[in-house]
């Protein structure tokens, strides 16, 4: 990575505007999953230990440019204080007189959490005036919010035009891991692409077909490929307008010498619920009024063998409706195979796949779990991320 990192600056006595991703799930004012807060700790601790005055900025939810009381960041400051072992003050502004006063009262090594940046209408519009207002609070900008790096917003991209900047440790790690995987992968290199819709994964499949040795398909999007091969899919998810594209992808795989794996058997149900009637059928035998909600046992065995023989695996999207216990088996099989494969470097592309390995208690067995669903997806599509492009070059 040719962007400046934390080691390129002397932070002693400097005020740092550090963009983090504290967009955490909350219930009744309590944080239900603090993975993203934990992920930002190394950068926050380093800046504080180096004697910087640390201003943390993040979004939370979608307040659409106005103040929403339930989306204030105060509960995050409380939890952060416990994790850092020192008081983190929450300010009810992200810029302005109150924020300025709080910044001026901060000691070297002190940490301050600014208010939700999306309370300001200019944030998502990348308004230069708002970006300048953020920049006026600090000497250096650090972006550690990989989860928001694909957004060109005032606190992720705009501010970088007005301050010297650097990637934080988390941002650096994400870019290194994903960058290495896509530019210089260990082989065999396998991509596992699941999830509901083909349309969400078009760019990823297209880009990865130029790079991988094996492509494994699962989840709802698989049935458009199954149908494209001439099988009936009953009431399974199907995108009629993507059938030609599915055929093109399968042809491209053949031309590129990529092995293309699709379900050979599935678990079908007569209703989308945990207590529906369900049965295992071959891919050629999906009944007209039933829908496929998971990959079957034969498919799982095939996929497991491919994964265990791979040196690098990128996984994005579940194999079935893992939120329902009855249809979690396929996703669990992939997660278990990666957990057991000691010679395989596994990269979990955020979002649902990350939630699944977390749910199965296998998160610590994965080599790298990306903190950015949308950002890692766009990176895997080969797109440049605005929040990264804007950072200072070495």
UniProtKB/Swiss-Prot annotation:
Binding site for substrate: 21-23, 36, 59-62, 118, 151
EC assignment: 2.7.2.3
Keywords for the protein's UniProt record, in alphabetical order: ATP-binding, Cytoplasm, Glycolysis, Kinase, Nucleotide-binding, Phosphoprotein, Transferase
This protein's pathway: Carbohydrate degradation; glycolysis; pyruvate from D-glyceraldehyde 3-phosphate: step 2/5
SUPFAM superfamilies in the cross-refs: Phosphoglycerate kinase
Pfam families reported in the protein's UniProt record: PGK (PF00162)
GO molecular function terms noted in the UniProt entry: ADP binding; ATP binding; phosphoglycerate kinase activity
Reaction equations catalysed: (2R)-3-phosphoglycerate + ATP = (2R)-3-phospho-glyceroyl phosphate + ADP
GO biological process, one term: gluconeogenesis
Compartment(s) where it occurs, according to its Swiss-Prot or TrEMBL record: Cytoplasm
Phosphoserine modifications at: 183
Residues noted as binding ATP in the record, renumbered to the chain: 201, 323, 350-353
GO cellular component: cytosol
Modification sites for Phosphothreonine: 299
Top-level lineage group: Bacteria
InterPro entries: Phosphoglycerate_kinase, Phosphoglycerate_kinase_CS, Phosphoglycerate_kinase_N, Phosphoglycerate_kinase_sf
Family: Belongs to the phosphoglycerate kinase family.
Subunit structure: Monomer.
Protein name, UniProt field: Phosphoglycerate kinase
Organism: Shouchella clausii (strain KSM-K16)
């Amino acid at each position: 990575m040719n962007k400046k990192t934390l080691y390129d600056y002397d932070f002693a006595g400097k005020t740092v505007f550090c963009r983090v991703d504290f967009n955490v799930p909350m219930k009744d004012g309590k944080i239900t999953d603090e993975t993203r807060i934990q992920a930002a700790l190394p950068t926050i601790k380093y800046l504080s230990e180096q004697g910087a005055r640390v201003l943390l900025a993040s979004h939370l939810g979608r307040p659409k440019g106005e103040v929403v009381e339930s989306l204030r960041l105060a509960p995050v400051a409380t939890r952060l204080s416990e994790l850092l072992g020192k008081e983190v003050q929450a300010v009810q502004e992200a810029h302005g007189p109150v924020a300025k006063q709080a910044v001026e009262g901060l000691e070297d090594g002190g940490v301050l959490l600014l208010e939700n940046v999306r309370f300001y209408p200019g944030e998502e519009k990348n308004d230069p005036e708002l970006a300048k207002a953020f920049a006026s609070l600090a000497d250096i900008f650090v972006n550690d919010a990989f989860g928001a790096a694909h957004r060109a917003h005032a606190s992720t991209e705009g501010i970088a035009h007005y301050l010297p900047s650097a990637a934080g440790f988390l941002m650096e790690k994400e870019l290194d891991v994903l960058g290495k995987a896509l530019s210089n992968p260990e082989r065999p290199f396998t991509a596992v692409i699941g999830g509901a819709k083909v349309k969400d994964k078009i760019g990823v499949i297209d880009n990865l077909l130029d790079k991988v040795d094996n492509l494994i398909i699962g989840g709802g999007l698989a049935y458009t490929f199954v149908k494209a091969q001439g099988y009936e899919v009953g009431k399974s998810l199907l995108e009629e307008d993507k059938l030609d594209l599915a055929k093109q992808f399968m042809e491209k795989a053949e031309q590129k010498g990529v092995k293309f794996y699709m379900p050979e058997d599935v678990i079908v149900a007569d209703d989308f619920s945990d207590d529906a009637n369900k049965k295992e059928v071959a891919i050629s035998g999906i009944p007209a009024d039933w829908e496929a909600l998971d990959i079957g046992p034969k498919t799982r065995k095939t996929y497991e063998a491919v994964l265990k023989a791979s040196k690098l695996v990128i996984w994005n999207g579940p194999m079935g409706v893992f939120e329902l216990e009855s249809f979690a088996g396929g996703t669990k099989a992939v997660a278990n195979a990666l957990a057991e494969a000691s010679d395989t470097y596994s990269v979990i592309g955020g979002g649902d796949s990350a939630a699944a390995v977390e749910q199965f208690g296998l998160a610590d067995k994965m080599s790298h779990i990306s903190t950015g669903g949308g950002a890692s997806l766009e990176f895997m599509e080969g797109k440049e991320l605005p929040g990264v492009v804007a950072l200072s070059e070495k």
